[in-house]
Swiss-Prot record:
GO CC terms of this entry: cytosol
Pathway per the UniProt entry: Amino-acid biosynthesis; L-histidine biosynthesis; L-histidine from 5-phospho-alpha-D-ribose 1-diphosphate: step 9/9
InterPro entries recorded: Ald_DH/histidinol_DH, Histidinol_DH_CS, Histidinol_DH_monofunct, Hstdl_DH
Function: Catalyzes the sequential NAD-dependent oxidations of L-histidinol to L-histidinaldehyde and then to L-histidine.
Residues the record lists as binding substrate: T252, Q274, H277, H344, D377, E431, H436
Catalysis performed (reactions): L-histidinol + 2 NAD(+) + H2O = L-histidine + 2 NADH + 3 H(+)
Family indicated by similarity: Belongs to the histidinol dehydrogenase family.
UniProt keyword annotation of Transmembrane helix present: no
GO MF term set: histidinol dehydrogenase activity; NAD binding; zinc ion binding
Name this polypeptide is given: Histidinol dehydrogenase
Required cofactor names: Zn(2+)
Active-site residue numbers: E343, H344
List of residues binding Zn(2+): Q274, H277, D377, H436
Length: 449
């Protein structure tokens, strides 16, 4: 019998229904230790806070080996990037922008008012964040799609001031990659910074108003969103509180719930495509079919080596963060998937919609064989900035809501306040905060005068 070449580790959970604690111990999970790089990143953030753009440029030259002539990319450079871009890429970007905008425009919540009789209303309104910094990475790959996924929901929320920051590229004159600039142009973003890494995050958070040229004044933002490497994530942790952040994103991940009828070639390619991002990327198959597990492993082993990024893919698939989980049945597969809480979850089963309805924890759910994760990465219309490392148990992906602040507007007239005053005073006394009660009483003590 021909020996099967195995790429992915197999975890056999058959024979019992695992508990949540057991699953958190045994499921493949990689992740990164952000604490390990804080001693490197903290001095960078502090120096940029103190010295501004000069420090950011120094660190960019040290880490990226390139120093742009200015941090703010000139408008003519942005214009030229779009003019020079392949028309097919331009059309693809436009189509993705249109679909993402269509989805995110529908997410806008409506203002609503609750009334407690005449003269007592609580109105919840939604106010957009004023200024947002959007980070577009430029490491193993270039991500104009991330520009779209961050900019569009911010625009739909009504954010008035947007800046995109992306690493300068030595091969492109010290400016960010042209596709990043072109995407910004298509989206109507006019402020782009040639800055990456932890220094970009710090500069977005603290800004710099010391420049002689007013065009180079770099105003701080109120929120920073967008993916990045471990150093970017560590910097976001350090500036959190000074600004808001979307999340501390870890390495990307996919989990696939599949049964015996699933196509092993499709699953293999979906696992490979996610592993292509990063050597720390996680690719996990959860199945009740031992035969499917074996066939997927064979297909992965046969096909990964012909990809352009084969070494990266191989390391990711062989890592502790990737694997195949065998279970007794689909209900158990759902339990496992919920415990794993994948960034991306694909469902390849009979009645896949019914299975998807049972899922509680996932950044995004891709239902059926014709809804692969790469579709969501680019052009489905959904957002690809999603919670990682199990955080989908309590958080969700980037959306229009991310950039909106729900604010309660309270209005009570004299009659309405009088009606509830005894309740307020009683609670104030119960908490031993008598001045709270006096603030109510004083409004009615001389009411007849």
């Amino acid at each position: 019998m021909r020996k099967r070449k195995i790429m992915l580790n197999v975890i056999d959970l058959r024979g019992h229904v695992p508990t949540t604690s057991e699953l958190r111990r045994t499921l493949p999970r990689g992740g990164t230790d952000i604490n390990s790089v804080l001693p490197i990143v903290e001095p960078v953030v502090t120096d940029v806070k103190n010295r501004g753009a000069a420090a950011a440029l120094d660190y960019g030259e040290k880490f990226d080996h390139v120093r742009p002539t200015s941090i703010r990319v000139p408008q003519d450079v942005i214009d030229q990037a779009l003019d020079s871009l392949d028309p097919n890429v331009i059309e693809a970007l436009k189509e993705s922008i249109a679909r993402v905008r269509a989805v995110h425009s529908e997410q806008l919540p409506a203002q609503h008012t609750t009334s407690f009789g005449e003269g007592a209303t609580i109105t919840e309104k939604f106010i957009p964040v004023s200024r947002v910094g959007l980070y577009a990475p430029g490491g193993n790959a270039v991500y104009p799609s991330s520009v779209i996924m961050n900019v569009v929901p911010a625009q739909e929320a009504g954010v008035e001031s947007l800046v995109v920051a992306s690493p300068p590229q030595k091969d492109h004159g010290g400016w960010p990659h042209p596709t990043i600039l072109a995407a910004a142009k298509l989206l109507g973003v006019t402020e782009v910074w040639a800055m990456g890494g932890a220094q970009a995050v710090a500069l977005l958070a603290y800004g710099d108003d010391t420049q002689q040229n007013s065009a180079e004044v770099l105003e701080p933002v109120d929120m920073i969103t967008g993916p990045g490497n471990i150093f970017v994530t560590a910097a976001k942790r350090l500036v959190r509180g000074v600004v808001g952040i979307d999340s501390e994103a870890g390495p990307t991940e996919i989990a696939i719930v599949a049964d015996a009828q699933a196509n092993p070639v499709w699953i293999a390619y979906d696992l490979i495509s996610q592993a292509e991002h990063d050597v720390l990327a996680a690719s996990v198959l959860i199945t009740d079919s031992e035969e499917l597990a074996q066939r997927v492993n064979e297909e992965v082993a046969a096909r990964y080596s012909v990809t352009r990024n084969a070494d990266r893919v191989s390391e990711a698939l062989k890592g502790q963060q990737s694997g195949i989980v065998l279970v007794d049945d689909l209900p158990t597969a759902v339990i496992v998937a919920d415990a794993y809480a994948a960034e991306h979850l694909e469902i390849h089963t009979a009645e896949s919609h019914k299975v998807a309805e049972q899922i509680r924890n996932a950044g995004a759910i891709f239902v059926g064989g014709y809804s692969p994760v790469p579709l969501g990465d680019y052009s489905a219309g959904s957002n690809h900035v999603l919670p990682t490392s199990g955080s989908a148990r309590y958080s969700s992906g980037l959306s229009t809501h991310t950039f909106l602040k729900p604010v309660n507007v309270i209005y009570y007239d004299e009659v309405a306040l009088k009606e509830i005053s005894d309740t307020v005073i009683t609670l104030a006394d119960a908490e031993d905060l008598p001045a709270h009660g006096e603030a109510i009483r004083t409004r009615f003590e001389n009411l007849g005068n």
